[in-house]
Structure formats: structure tokens, C-alpha cells
């Protein structure tokens, strides 16, 4: 049996309708999603990740300053372990390190990344290291929107937005698992108006793809994993050239073998597909597909990459599709999961 955990925004300020974390059982025979739990949590469990052994789930509480841990029970449901304060406001991303001893959190308005020790029982312990993202002036910050590992989990990419006072950038850190410390190796700064949001790392660890929220674009960068350096090589739009309206690019994702890159567009309510040249890393736009809903903040493949999902935050739907890597085409399976204000999906 496989499971899906859906983080749902909950607050009136976010115009949200969710109640917390939902657990679903997914039938291996039919693919049907069956809700088995709705765990009411602290506000806005807006992003979550499992530890490497998949025994525990960790969730950040958007717009607040807390991070929570949960035990995954034998029946797939969640039980509370603990919640800690990190100090930085609006944690937006969380990921385990390669040793499974730490969870790393990016806080947007906190302008920082926090390395948190995991206790033996799966609960969250103390913060052992904090990396602050400096802004343009003393006391200003750059807004950390994502912290994600390279494929070897030796380097941490921290994607930051400027929001007038900081820098739109990717800061690269080398990670020391002995003490959880981070040492900067590079800093790529994007165009002033782009507002970088998320990156995806190719399986070969040499190609990095950055989706830019305000620029509505995708940037390709090469990565040297011997010294932790980035170099920008290409930029393509995420919106069709016949579309003249507003847009807010959101998430990026690579297919299993790294041949297809996908980006999601809010307001335009679509995904864009690119084919990746496996020798050079350059992108070629393949086409656009509606997400059949409003505000596709989050996109994901399931565990074996056989199915693709777009979480439409403002229409309360998760839309299932299937990617053919050979042709680079998406097809709709017809399955739509209805859940309130979905903003993150974790498969187990």
C-alpha cells in the first residue's frame, strides 16, 4: 500500500479552507485515493518532507515560526511528536541531510536557513547552525524560498528572492555532516526583476534549472560539483508568446531520467514542458497544459514517476496526469482529488 500526505493551508489571511495535514491511502490496484486522516495542526502546514527512512514526517507552518514532527504509524496515519520554534518567520521548505541526523529549513521572512538536529525518537531537537541571507543594506535580508540538495547531498542550494531589500540569488553551501555547519562556495545573482523561486537538479548533478516567479522564466545553469560553482547559460519563458496577461511562475520538476523539465504557472493556470539536451543541458520548449484548476502552487510525481500531480491551491483540487517521456506529452487520467487548499504532497 502507498500513501500520500497533503499539506493544506488553513488561515483566513491566505483565504484558505484547509484544516491541516491529510493522509490518503492509494490503492495499488485502482490508483484510487482514500482519505484516512485529517490531522488538525498548527496553522498552515504548507510544506513537508520525510526523513530518509520514511518513519517520520516534518512540516513547516507557513506565515508562522514553527516546525513540527510526526510519527508515521503502521496504518499510514500520523501522530504528533513535537513542535519547535525556529525564530525565523514563514518557514517554506524542509529537507533531511544525507546522514538523516538533521532537517534543514528555509524561512522566507526570516531570511535564513536553519539546520535542526533530529532526536533518536524522530522528534526535532536543537538548532545547530543558522545561515543568514544578507540584503542590500545593513539589517536587510534576502528572502530564502527553498533549500535543496545537489544529487550527492554534499551541497545545499538556497534560493532567495529580493523583494526590494535583498538579492534574487542562489547561494551554494558545502555541508559538514559532523556538526551541521554550512560553508558558502558560490552565489549566483539573477536579473533584478526575476525573483528566483525554486531549483531542480538534473540526475547527472551538472545541470540546474531555476524557475523565476516574477520573470516568468526558467534559467539553466551548469554546476561544477567539485568546487560548488554555478554558471548561467540559458533563459526561456514559462509562458506562451501569445499570452499577454499576468503570471506567477511557481514550481519546477524534472522527470525521472532528466529528459523532461516541468514548470507551473499560476494565473495562467498551466504547466510548461521542456526537453533537456542530455549532452549540453539546454532546454527546448515542448508545450503547455492547463492544470484544470486555480493556482498550481505545487507539482510532483508519485514514487515511481508513473503519475504526475498538480495541486491547485485555490480550486481545492489535485489533478492527476501521466507523462510520456519519449514524446514529451502529458495526458490527463481523469482522476481529480478534491481537498481544501492543497499546497504540498509527499508520497510514501
Locate predicted features.
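Beta-rich catalytic cores
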Residues: 17, 44-46, 90, 143, ...
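Short loop/turn segments immediately following beta-strands, especially the blade-tip
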Residues: 24-31, 70-77, 115-125, 172-181, ...
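A short beta-strand motif characteristic of beta-propeller blades
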Residues: 34-40, 79-85, 128-137, 183-190, ...
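Residue-level detector of Asp-centered blade-edge/turn motifs that repeat once per structural unit
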Residues: 50-54, 96-100, 150-153, 203-205, ...
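Asp-box/WD-like beta-propeller blade repeats and closely related beta-sheet repeat scaffolds
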Residues: 78-150
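Loop/turn-rich, solvent-exposed surfaces of beta-rich toroidal or solenoidal domains
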Residues: 246-313
Amino acid at each position: 500500500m502507498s500513501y500520500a500526505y497533503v499539506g493544506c493551508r488553513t488561515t483566513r489571511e491566505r483565504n484558505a479552507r484547509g484544516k491541516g495535514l491529510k493522509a490518503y491511502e492509494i490503492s495499488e490496484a485502482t490508483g484510487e485515493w482514500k482519505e484516512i486522516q485529517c490531522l488538525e495542526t498548527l496553522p498552515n502546514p504548507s510544506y513537508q518532507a520525510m526523513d530518509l527512512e520514511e518513519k517520520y514526517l516534518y512540516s513547516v507552518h507557513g506565515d508562522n515560526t514553527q516546525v513540527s514532527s510526526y510519527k508515521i504509524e503502521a496504518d499510514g496515519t500520523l501522530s504528533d511528536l513535537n513542535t519547535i520554534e525556529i525564530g525565523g518567520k514563514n518557514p517554506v521548505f524542509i529537507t533531511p541531510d544525507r546522514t538523516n541526523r538533521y532537517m534543514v529549513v528555509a524561512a522566507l521572512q526570516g531570511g535564513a536557513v536553519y539546520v535542526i538536529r533530529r532526536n533518536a525518537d524522530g522528534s526535532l531537537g536543537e538548532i545547530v547552525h543558522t545561515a543568514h541571507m544578507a540584503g542590500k543594506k545593513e539589517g536587510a535580508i534576502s528572502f530564502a524560498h527553498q533549500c535543496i540538495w545537489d544529487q550527492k547531498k554534499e551541497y545545499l542550494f538556497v534560493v532567495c528572492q529580493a523583494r526590494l531589500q535583498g538579492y534574487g540569488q542562489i547561494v551554494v553551501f558545502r555541508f559538514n555532516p559532523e556538526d551541521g555547519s554550512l560553508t558558502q562556495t558560490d552565489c549566483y545573482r539573477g536579473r533584478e526583476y526575476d525573483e528566483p523561486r525554486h531549483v531542480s537538479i538534473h540526475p547527472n548533478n551538472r545541470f540546474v534549472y531555476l524557475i523565476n516567479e516574477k520573470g516568468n522564466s526558467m534559467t539553466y545553469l551548469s554546476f561544477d560539483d567539485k568546487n560548488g560553482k554555478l554558471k548561467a547559460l540559458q533563459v526561456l519563458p514559462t509562458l506562451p508568446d501569445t499570452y499577454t496577461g499576468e503570471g506567477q511562475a511557481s514550481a519546477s520538476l524534472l522527470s525521472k531520467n532528466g529528459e523532461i523539465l516541468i514548470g507551473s504557472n499560476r494565473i495562467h493556470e498551466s504547466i510548461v514542458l521542456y526537453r533537456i539536451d542530455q549532452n549540453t543541458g539546454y532546454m527546448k520548449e515542448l508545450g503547455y497544459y492547463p492544470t484544470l484548476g486555480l493556482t498550481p502552487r505545487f507539482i510532483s510525481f508519485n514514487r515511481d514517476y508513473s503519475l504526475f500531480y498538480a495541486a491547485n491551491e485555490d480550486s481545492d483540487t489535485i489533478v492527476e496526469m501521466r507523462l510520456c517521456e519519449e514524446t514529451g506529452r502529458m495526458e490527463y487520467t481523469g482522476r481529480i482529488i478534491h481537498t481544501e487548499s492543497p499546497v504540498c504532497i509527499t508520497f510514501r
